[in-house]
């Protein structure tokens, strides 16, 4: 009798779950990422290895670290990505402001993960630039900017704060995985992930590693000019292709607040309708416009909370409106996320 070409369902599942190890022509070198890993054949340590071509074309099994990441982040209720298509629109500044906004409620615990590997600015803005990473039997301990605000960044690992990080993609991806797998985040109400501009390896890695544990969505940051909106359209397209919900769009630097009289005037003209019109065109929520206040830069330079230092600023009131709009988009009670009694 001719053998059947149909495999048993259980054996098929077993093969998919346990792919065969590729036949190597040389022993695995030191620092090898593993012949079955997602980085096999592409990592920096693979350069010059006789097995590189074999590993690069071999079938890849599921990443064994994904379940560990999911378990590590099981105590995190909400995960939010902060994205911008263009650099210089104030994305990291907005991340720090959003973190302080959430942390104004003492009942909430907030974490910020800085994945802008080559330009880590979050520690400076949150006042923990001089901190270092402490390693214990339970993992890496984040730095605490406040009793309820934790921070993790590559800045804590640099011997000198002005050292440049010159890394290729696989090494960046490895560090992001460590931030998720090895950092003892504990129980958090919100984990904010600050990302670099564009759609690079860092964005793909964060999406891959967090997909199983669940991402609430992404907040887009732009300025009113069309040159910024052009890149935001690409970023929104990236999110839709990657299966990431876009929670809303924030228009930063929408005006200028005079520090003397607090009058607001327009500097960057919304030549094509600005963020509000783009949000309508793309079918996403418009969370609000935040004016440019020089005191925001001052608060970030000193690592202080803008909300505590300048509660009467129009920018402060606008940011609180953005936070409440974001809470609504996430299905949360805005008055619980940012209680009314905390308003100026």
Swiss-Prot record:
Species of provenance: Neurospora crassa (strain ATCC 24698 / 74-OR23-1A / CBS 708.71 / DSM 1257 / FGSC 987)
So where does [4Fe-4S] cluster 1 get bound? 32, 46, 49, 55
Its lineage opens with: Eukaryota, Fungi, Dikarya, Ascomycota, Pezizomycotina
Q: What does this protein do?
A: Component of the cytosolic iron-sulfur (Fe/S) protein assembly (CIA) machinery. Required for maturation of extramitochondrial Fe-S proteins. The NBP35-CFD1 heterotetramer forms a Fe-S scaffold complex, mediating the de novo assembly of an Fe-S cluster and its transfer to target apoproteins.
Annotated residues that bind ATP are located at 85-92
Q: What is this protein called?
A: Cytosolic Fe-S cluster assembly factor nbp35
Instruction: Quote the record's cofactor note.
Output: Binds 4 [4Fe-4S] clusters per heterotetramer. Contains two stable clusters in the N-termini of NBP35 and two labile, bridging clusters between subunits of the NBP35-CFD1 heterotetramer.
Quaternary structure per UniProt? Heterotetramer of 2 NBP35 and 2 CFD1 chains.
Could you cite one Gene Ontology molecular function of this protein?
iron-sulfur cluster binding
Name the protein family: Belongs to the Mrp/NBP35 ATP-binding proteins family. NUBP1/NBP35 subfamily.
Write down the Pfam families for this protein, in alphabetical order: ParA
The yes or no answer to whether the keyword ATP-binding is present is: yes
Q: Which residues bind [4Fe-4S] cluster 2?
A: 258, 261
InterPro entries, A to Z: Mrp-like_CS, Mrp/NBP35_ATP-bd, NUBP1/Nbp35, P-loop_NTPase, YlxH/NBP35
Q: Report one GO cellular component.
A: cytosol
Task: Tell me if Protein biosynthesis is a UniProt keyword of this record.
Answer: no
Matches recorded under PANTHER family = CYTOSOLIC FE-S CLUSTER ASSEMBLY FACTOR NUBP1, NUCLEOTIDE-BINDING PROTEIN NBP35 YEAST -RELATED
What keywords are annotated for this sequence in UniProt? Answer: 4Fe-4S, ATP-binding, Cytoplasm, Iron, Iron-sulfur, Metal-binding, Nucleotide-binding
Main localization is: cytoplasm
Q: Which domain of life is it from?
A: Eukaryota
Q: Which cofactor does it need?
A: [4Fe-4S] cluster
Locations listed in the record: Cytoplasm
Stretches for region Disordered: 19-43
């Amino acid at each position: 009798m001719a053998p059947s070409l149909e495999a048993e369902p259980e054996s098929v599942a077993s093969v998919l779950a346990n792919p065969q190890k590729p036949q190597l022509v040389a022993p695995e070198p030191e620092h090898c990422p593993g012949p079955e890993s997602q980085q096999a054949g592409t990592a920096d340590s693979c350069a010059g290895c006789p097995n590189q071509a074999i590993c690069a074309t071999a079938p890849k099994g599921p990443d064994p670290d994904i379940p560990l990441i999911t378990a590590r982040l099981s105590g995190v209720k909400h995960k939010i990505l902060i994205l911008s298509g263009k650099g210089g629109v104030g994305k990291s500044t907005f991340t720090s402001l959003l973190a302080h906004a959430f942390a104004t409620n003492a009942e909430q615990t907030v974490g910020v993960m800085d994945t802008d590997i080559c330009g880590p600015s979050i520690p400076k803005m949150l006042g923990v630039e001089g901190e270092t990473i402490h390693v214990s039997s339970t993992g890496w301990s984040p730095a605490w900017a406040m009793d309820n605000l934790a921070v993790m960044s590559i800045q804590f690992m640099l011997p000198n704060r002005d050292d440049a990080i010159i890394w290729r993609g696989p090494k960046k991806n490895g560090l992001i995985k460590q931030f998720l797998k090895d950092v003892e985040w504990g129980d958090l109400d919100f984990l904010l992930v600050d990302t670099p501009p564009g759609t690079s390896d860092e964005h793909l890695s964060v999406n891959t590693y967090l997909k199983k544990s669940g991402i609430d969505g992404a907040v887009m940051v732009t300025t009113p000019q069309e040159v910024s909106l052009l890149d935001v359209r690409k970023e929104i397209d990236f999110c839709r292709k990657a299966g990431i919900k876009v929670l809303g769009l924030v228009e930063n630097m929408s005006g200028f607040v005079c520090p003397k009289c607090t009058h607001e005037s327009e500097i960057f003209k919304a030549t094509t309708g600005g963020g509000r019109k783009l949000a309508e065109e793309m079918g996403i929520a418009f969370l609000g416009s935040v004016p440019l206040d020089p005191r925001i830069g001052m608060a970030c330079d000193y690592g202080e909370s803008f909300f505590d230092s300048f509660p009467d600023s129009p920018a402060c009131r606008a940011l609180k409106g953005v936070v409440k709009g974001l809470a609504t988009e996430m299905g949360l009670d805005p008055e619980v996320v940012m209680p009314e009694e905390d308003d100026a």
